[in-house]
Amino acid sequence: MKGKTIHKVLRLLLCISLPFIFHFSPFTLRAQDQHFSMLDLDPLLFNPAYSGFFDGTGRFGVVYRNQWASVSTPFQTVSATAEFALTRSSRNMNGLSAGLWLSADRAGTLDYGSTSASAIVSYFQGLGDGNHILSLALEAGVGQSGFSPDRMVADDATEAFVRTRALYPTLGAGAAWFWQLNESLYTKLGIAMRNINEPDISFTELSSDARLSRRLTVYARGEWRTASQWGVMPVLGFQHQRNFNELVYGCDVRWYIRESSPDFLAFSAGLLGRHGDAAAINLGVLWREWTFAFSYDANLSRLASASHTIGAFEVGVVYMIAKRSAKRSSLPCPIF
């Protein structure tokens, strides 16, 4: 018994230390600006196939991020999601889900920003004995990007521009896999491709160099119930878009205080590393059908001296129309 306890403690320490081990390793990656440190609050950002990956009939979420607060005009991002279970059969272990994802960001003295809206349809199917679930999704949306030329300092601020607003369609697809090994361990893995059509976003002239490049995302999350009230949740995410890469890694620890409906209550805390860019701390409260979360990340990149290491803070809230059982003594399937 003593040996098992030591083994659990060592695994927990390894999970917590992973963000720092990766972050200070010798290789570096270039990251994109638009991202969230609270990955689970906006799962559709990583993969449309995660639409419907929840134990309920509907889910709604909003996340706000304020980055580089030390500058005069910080980079701000907000996203909102709505997901609905259209059909769901626990007998055949399959179903259909629909989702809506909205995102907007803005920064700089030119008031440059973008807005996106996407509709998502996903189909999921249980495999084998039901411990495996495969989800496939398609996404179609529209985006707009633009800036305010009247804020430019030039002889003729509009002379070189054909337009100051670009409106374009976007297409995406994704796949996700869920595997529950036993009552104490599960994992989910997903891969997606966004901007498959690579729309034109040029403000000057139509050019292949001014297209919104395809974005590849990979996301993995697991949970291991180390005891009746504790869960360890490692996470790994990767995004690639043209010459830019982003690698995030971290681990959360969740304390389940009450698992009986309707007074479900749990707390979570974790560390996240964005390689070569930032380190973040995440805090969350899960109460009944609500999830409240806060995150703060410190800038550890070469911009740290200019930003005074002030990175970003995030706040988010998620509401789920749930169908919880009276008591959950083990990890539930995220869908059925």
Ranges and model annotations:
Residues M1-D33, A322-F336:
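Cleavable N-terminal export/targeting peptides
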Residues Q32-F336:
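Subset of outer-membrane beta-barrel
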